[in-house]
Amino acid sequence: MDMLRSACFYFLLIVFVILSWSLLCDSRHLGHMEKKLSVNLDLLNKDNEEITKLEAPSTNKTNTLLSQSHAVVNHGDNGQINGKKTKEIHRVKRASDKKVSSKRVSRTWKIPKYPKKQPKSDQEHPGFNLDYMQPTTHPPHHN
């Protein structure tokens, strides 16, 4: 009888641990990600247009004209672009091609501007060397 109780206790303990871990985990399952990957291309085009509208206004008029002229175009299977047939190759400006100004990136300290061929070693950030120092083998001396 005592052995049956201990076996039931351990079984319930294992079930409780497994259930508590599965309830504590907030990770997404792969099924949700697969559904998100099969998004309609029309929705992507609408989202891309909204993103270009939400970008910071540019002071240069040519940049705004270029960003508007390079809108994403939906290509059909038969070579039609927006209902017109064309034989020319159209390029779509991608987000990776855009230049990001350095003011948008936050930094904890000022990054020095050295020439890439000859970096100045005397002006390195002091935290870098301290992170990779070897441990000291001498005990502290108290007088």
Swiss-Prot record:
Glycans are attached at residue 60. Residues 74-143 are annotated as: Disordered. Residues 1-27 form the signal peptide. Induction: Induced by auxin. GO terms for biological process: cell differentiation; lateral root development; regulation of root development; regulation of root morphogenesis; response to auxin. The tyrosine sulfation is critical for the function of the peptide. InterPro entries: RGF. Residues 74-83 have a biased composition (Polar residues). It comes from the Eukaryota. GO terms for cellular component: extracellular region; nucleus. Keywords: Differentiation, Glycoprotein, Growth factor, Hydroxylation, Nucleus, Secreted, Signal, Sulfation. The modification Sulfotyrosine is found at residue 132. A motif (Nuclear localization signal) lies at residues 92-99. GO terms for molecular function: growth factor activity. The modification Hydroxyproline is found at residue 140. Residues 28-130 form a propeptide. Expressed in root tips. The keyword Glycoprotein applies. PANTHER family: ROOT MERISTEM GROWTH FACTOR 10 (PTHR34961:SF1), TRANSMEMBRANE PROTEIN (PTHR34961). Belongs to the RGF family. When applied in the extracellular space, triggers a root waving phenotype. But seems to have a physiological nuclear subcellular location where it promotes root elongation. This is Root meristem growth factor 10. The gene is RGF10.
